[in-house]
């Protein structure tokens, strides 16, 4: 059966989205092991995650200029394999300082990968007039599930973090040459020059970025503190704790796989409002339940609720008049990922002084803010993606 060019491009882009999810899933699921391996306390873990965040913010800030100069295709080709080489450095760490330096390398490369892969996804939507941003973000979640599950497997086998990271990422890189031929040229390459757009960033794009910051902050709290919450506050085993991000990402995959169809059926406002409410409910269950199994269910509900939210922001921003898809992607990525990179370390300082369970009370508040922000997406206009459904 002949495979269409769109399917090949979407599959190649999905591969690059899986990579950061895989890295992040393994890193977060093995956080208890990395903590014991380096002897770091909660305050030091918070500082280490801050190093991760600052490095990511530097690359996110530079990504718009770098991508404009060298194209998202070139940047992604270079930084995707570098990210896979950076994570095993964390497995070699034997002190908090070494772990912090490894996190700088991971955060710096991940920032470039995040912006360039989102730009590629928007380029595919624009080239074929078919939706794929939600599908791409589902691929990231699939990577997170795989990373979490392999992390739990290696933890159950009492394998080192270095062996865990190296074996899984070596297998991932075997498919790298197959994805390269199907990457997309940026719009400036297709038109032979720079696109004429306003130098000002539209307010709606900034709104999408701000709300993405809130959503990613909530996601980041699950990824970097969820396993530790179960391990330290709920008396769960390391194996059970490692399943937190996997449970979260599994339901997020389901939600994002049907995200485009849900947008077409209900519109952005009802989808964002319902998703925020479900995330609020899920995190509340996590905080009040004394049972680890019920906490996993709460995180699963939270993943399902947050699933369609960020893809809507990227899609709407990328189709906003007066700005290129690449620049819109960079703006939303920079603002959004600042949440996942900076907010969790701040939770570390709160946890050190107030306790982790108390610090995580902030998360339901963030979900409520997302529900309030959905008010700005009230419109009777059908998403453009609905005109060409999968």
PLM features per residue range, with description:
Residues 74-88, 270-285, 364:
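Structural signature of the two symmetry-related core transmembrane helices
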Residues 162-180, 360-376:
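Symmetry-related core transmembrane helices of the 12-TM Major Facilitator Superfamily/SLC fold
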Residues 91-102, 288-297:
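Helix-loop junctions at membrane interfaces in 12-TM secondary transporters
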Residues 39, 71, 92-94, 235, ...:
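Helix-breaking motifs and short loop linkers at transmembrane-helix boundaries and internal kinks
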Residues 29-43, 224-240:
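Short amphipathic helix-loop junctions that connect adjacent transmembrane helices
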Residues 103-138:
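Cytoplasmic helix-loop-helix junction between adjacent transmembrane helices
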Residues 59-71, 155, 255-267, 351-352:
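Helix-to-loop junctions at the C-terminal end of transmembrane segments
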Residues 58-94:
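Conserved MFS/SLC helix-loop-helix module at the cytosolic interface between two early adjacent transmembrane helices
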């Amino acid at each position: 059966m002949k495979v269409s060019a769109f399917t090949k491009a979407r599959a190649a882009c999905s591969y690059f989205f899986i990579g950061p999810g895989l890295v992040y899933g393994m890193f977060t699921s093995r956080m208890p092991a990395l903590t014991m391996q380096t002897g770091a306390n909660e305050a030091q873990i918070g500082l280490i995650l801050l190093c991760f965040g600052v490095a990511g913010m530097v690359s996110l800030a530079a990504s718009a200029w770098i991508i404009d100069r060298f194209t998202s295709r070139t940047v992604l080709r270079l930084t995707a394999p570098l990210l896979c080489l950076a994570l095993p450095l964390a497995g070699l760490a034997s002190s908090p300082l070494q772990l912090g330096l490894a996190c700088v390398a991971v955060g710096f490369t991940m920032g470039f990968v995040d912006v360039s892969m989102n730009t590629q996804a928007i380029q595919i939507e624009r080239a074929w007039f078919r939706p794929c941003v939600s599908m791409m973000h589902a691929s990231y979640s699939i990577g997170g599930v795989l990373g979490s599950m392999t992390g739990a497997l290696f933890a159950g086998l009492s394998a080192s973090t270095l062996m865990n990271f190296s074996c899984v990422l070596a297998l991932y890189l075997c498919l790298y040459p197959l994805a390269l031929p199907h990457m997309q040229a940026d719009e400036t390459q297709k038109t032979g020059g720079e696109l004429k757009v306003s130098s000002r960033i539209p307010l709606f794009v900034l709104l999408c970025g701000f709300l993405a910051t809130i959503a990613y902050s909530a996601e980041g709290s699950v990824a970097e503190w969820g396993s530790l919450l179960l391990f330290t506050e709920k008396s769960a085993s390391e194996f059970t704790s490692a399943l937190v991000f996997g449970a979260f990402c599994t339901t997020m995959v389901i939600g994002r796989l049907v995200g485009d169809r849900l947008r077409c059926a209900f519109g952005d406002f009802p989808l964002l409002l319902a998703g925020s409410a479900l995330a609020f409910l899920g995190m509340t269950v996590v905080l009040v339940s004394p049972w680890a199994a019920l906490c996993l269910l709460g995180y699963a509900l939270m993943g399902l609720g947050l699933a369609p939210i960020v893809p809507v922001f990227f899609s709407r921003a990328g189709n906003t008049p007066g700005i290129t898809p690449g620049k819109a992607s960079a703006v939303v990525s920079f603002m959004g990922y600042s949440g996942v990179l900076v907010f969790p370390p701040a939770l570390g300082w709160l946890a050190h002084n107030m306790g982790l369970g108390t610090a995580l009370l902030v998360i339901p508040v963030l979900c409520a803010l997302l529900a309030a922000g959905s008010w700005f997406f009230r419109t009777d206009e059908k998403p453009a993606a609905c005109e060409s459904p999968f």
